[in-house]
């Protein structure tokens, strides 16, 4: 009887770290602790940088089982901001991303691969400009822990390159692709 109780107790204690590791997070856009940034070649002479000001999403992260992790992000394409109102109006127009017709871009992961040393490969489907294509985000786990307000946070950074023609977006000059830089901090639900 004593051995049985010890075995049950040991099993319960050993399961605690695994249960505590799996967590669901809301991306902290309200606290401005997340950003979706872009960089695009401008006529072969320089780069234009910008961001999307409105987006939301969630992710699930389990450091003990990276493959069980997932992410979903929704981006309001009308919130594109390159710090130049006339250019933003043109990029949002039907000439390019047609934000009035395709006001939301969505990324849903299909697989998260642990590459070791905090490096991750996040594979998923991006719906942009009415077309859904598979993409890969090269990501890095930045850190996790308790914030000053008693909540739990987890943070990541990632990059990917999008070929505009893959999403039916007009290519102009040297701007055949856009580089994306992502910074995500989540607050545990």
From Swiss-Prot:
For this protein, the record's InterPro entries field holds:
Lipid/polyisoprenoid-bd_YceI (IPR007372), TTHA0802/YceI-like_sf (IPR036761), UPF0312/YceI (IPR023480)
Q: Which UniProt keywords apply?
A: Periplasm, Signal
Question: In its keyword annotation, does this UniProt entry include Signal?
Answer: yes
Tell me which domain of life the UniProt entry assigns to the organism this sequence originates from: Bacteria
Indicate yes or no for the key word Cell cycle: no
- What are the record's GO terms for cellular component? extracellular space; periplasmic space
Places the protein is found: Periplasm
Could you say which residues form the signal peptide?
1-22
What family classification does the UniProt entry report for this protein? Answer: Belongs to the UPF0312 family. Type 1 subfamily.
Record HAMAP family:
UPF0312 (MF_00780)
The protein's name in its UniProt record: UPF0312 protein VC_A0539
Species: Vibrio cholerae serotype O1 (strain ATCC 39315 / El Tor Inaba N16961)
